Amino acid sequence: MTIRNYNYHMTHFVISAPDIRHLPRDEGIEVAFAGRSNAGKSSALNTLTNQKGLARTSKTPGRTQLINLFEVVDGVRLVDLPGYGYAEVPEEMKLKWQRALGEYLQKRNCLKGLVVLMDIRHPLKDLDQQMITWAVAVGTPVLLLLTKADKLASGARKAQLNLVREAIIPFMGDIQVEAFSSLKKIGVDKLREKLDTWFSEIPPEVMAEEFDGEGE
């Protein structure tokens, strides 16, 4: 497989949807970003794309309730899933979000990879593990980003990284773990490399459409 290098700076917003029934047709290829409400998911997307306002960062964790789609090129999309695990959100809303997340991960056929973001100081909370379990169950590869890595000294960061790598072995899935910091740009290259790999598995029909478009 030839790895294609994508220009993530060209990524643009497409649509916000409450559930998978309101998303575009289930075709092309998608990589989803998931994490607790305070894990730094929006900041990671903004850093990846070098666009400060692409994904809205909220001062009130738990405010983002929709599935947000961003297009890199035709048929290649990044998906910002609703943040989870915020204590002050009503229980009914929590359950609604969890249903939407589970349904997307289990039923969206064009999903080819899942990026789960966790604060490096508080990794693998129950809902993080649930996301990983859902992904592994349907054979979706996972990249775990331990965010806010700049909050730890180099030695402590490496120790925490190794601890999480040991802890995820029982999940028995295709799971990679990397340290990440939007502020210090730690792990951004690793994220881009993984996305390029996943997106290089793009279906032939999408590649054909891109090629036809370039010839116009």
From Swiss-Prot:
GO terms for cellular component: cytosol. Keywords: Cell cycle, Cell division, GTP-binding, Magnesium, Metal-binding, Nucleotide-binding, Septation. Disulfide bonds: none annotated. Transmembrane segments: none annotated. GO terms for biological process: division septum assembly. Mg(2+) binds at S42, T64. Its cofactor is Mg(2+). GTP binds at residues 35-42, 62-66, 80-83, 147-150, 180-182. It comes from the Bacteria. GO terms for molecular function: GTP binding; metal ion binding. Residues 27-201 form the EngB-type G domain. Belongs to the TRAFAC class TrmE-Era-EngA-EngB-Septin-like GTPase superfamily. EngB GTPase family. Necessary for normal cell division and for the maintenance of normal septation. This is Probable GTP-binding protein EngB. The lineage of its organism: Bacteria, Pseudomonadati, Pseudomonadota, Gammaproteobacteria, Enterobacterales. The gene is engB.
